[in-house]
């Protein structure tokens, strides 16, 4: 089956573990979820046929939950518990770890300078963003007023783009979240946590941008 003309966001939702595959190749399936696989591969100078072959293998596995057809209220409840609450736990701990690593290893050329600052910025942006969703947008959608939420949704999508840009800065600061050979246990644990946070945030944004928001605007 050919996947190259399908949007990344759709593939990430319909094929188990496709999101992890796209992350491996640094392909943006959340904020850039509307671009086709062929276009995304061309931009990264990747072999689209090889990626299609990997997707074909993944597509043979059963999908755990197809959020594309789930009720909107169920999607919202899932987003809050699985992503919003998780981000609120993850980021303060990562900020503490980054502050410690930057202080203890300040003399090492490989130290991720500015990481605590960028994680703090992401934490502040997401805290405000998630509160607006939970207090304003999500109740509108649950009350069947999603088709009238074009303004709030466009703001949320813009803030998703801002978060995506901060993730790119964090990846650049951390050598694509790769610890150097001399990294201590805290440093390695922090990078594992950052990778998990990035995976969670990309899945979170993808579910909103590619499923919840379009269906809400369509009047479901």
From Swiss-Prot:
Binding partners and assembly: Homodimer.
NCBIfam families on file: FeS_repair_RIC, PRK10992.1
UniProt-listed Pfam families: Hemerythrin, ScdA_N
One GO cellular component, as annotated: cytoplasm
Encoding gene per record: ytfE
InterPro entries, per the entry: FeS-repair_YftE, Hemerythrin-like, RIC_family
CDD domains reported for this sequence: Hr-like
Protein species of origin: Citrobacter koseri (strain ATCC BAA-895 / CDC 4225-83 / SGSC4696)
One of the GO BP terms on file: response to nitrosative stress
Species classification: Bacteria, Pseudomonadati, Pseudomonadota, Gammaproteobacteria, Enterobacterales
Function: Di-iron-containing protein involved in the repair of iron-sulfur clusters damaged by oxidative and nitrosative stress conditions.
Compartments where found: Cytoplasm
Keywords tagged on the record: Cytoplasm, Iron, Metal-binding, Stress response
GO MF term set: metal ion binding
Name of this protein: Iron-sulfur cluster repair protein YtfE
Family of this protein: Belongs to the RIC family. YtfE subfamily.
Origin superkingdom: Bacteria
